């Protein structure tokens, strides 16, 4: 039996629940992916909406997996947490692909991983995100961005659109459309079609 590719979901307290639960719904339906939940030290992590997830220490993760990081109010202290940033930088840098949702891109930017790359983020937090990553080519109008192995989405629900786009890139458009239909989701297939564009 062929080994599944690990999807390493990195969590921290006060992450935004839909940032992760939406993309997980998509990724778990893709053939050959296995979902794993991690944090710096392991244990129970609580989302901003008080959902609890039992995580393992990130140090047990497959470095070559797919690294996924959400946003949410927990990213505000996270960008100043040197221990967490060191771990995030290592695993995101070594990953085969790196996906961030909402203000998760601010954390990647703080690690220097998005320097010189195109990226986007939650439009309501855009000023703060820009201040974190001044060397990033931030796109104010984008549902999601792809630059090399890095995928970054706009706020919250945009993570589902981005993840379906990621699936289309990996497995073909038909696979992504089928998953969207399976979850009864109206997919915005155009990464530049951003109804929440920052004016």
Show which residues each predicted segment covers.
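Extended, subdomain-level signal for the structured scaffold at the beginning of enzyme domains
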Residues: 1-98, 105-110, 116, 127-132, ...
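NAD(P)-dependent dehydrogenases' Rossmann-like dinucleotide-binding region
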Residues: 124
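Glycine/charged-rich beta-loop-alpha catalytic/anionic-binding loops adjacent to active sites
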Residues: 141-149
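A short glycine-threonine-serine/GTX helix/turn-capping micro-motif
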Residues: 149-155
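A structured phosphate/pyrophosphate-recognition subdomain
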Residues: 158
């Amino acid at each position: 039996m062929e080994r599944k590719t690990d999807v390493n979901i990195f969590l921290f307290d006060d992450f935004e629940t839909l940032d992760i639960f939406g993309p997980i719904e998509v990724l778990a339906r893709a053939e050959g992916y296995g979902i794993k939940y991690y944090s710096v030290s392991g244990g129970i992590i609580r989302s901003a909406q008080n959902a609890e997830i039992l995580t393992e220490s990130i140090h047990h993760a497959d470095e070559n997996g797919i690294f996924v990081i959400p946003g949410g109010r927990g990213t505000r202290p996270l960008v100043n947490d040197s221990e967490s940033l060191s771990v995030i930088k290592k695993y995101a840098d070594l990953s085969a692909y790196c996906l961030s949702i909402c203000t998760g891109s601010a954390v990647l930017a703080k690690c220097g991983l998005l320097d010189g790359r195109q990226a986007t983020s939650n439009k309501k937090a855009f000023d703060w995100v820009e201040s974190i990553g001044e060397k990033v080519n931030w796109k104010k109008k984008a549902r999601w961005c792809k630059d090399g192995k890095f995928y970054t989405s706009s706020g919250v629900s945009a993570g589902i659109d981005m993840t379906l786009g990621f699936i289309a890139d990996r497995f073909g458009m038909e696979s992504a459309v089928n998953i969207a239909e399976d979850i009864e989701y109206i997919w915005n297939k155009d990464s530049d079609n951003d109804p929440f564009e920052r004016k």
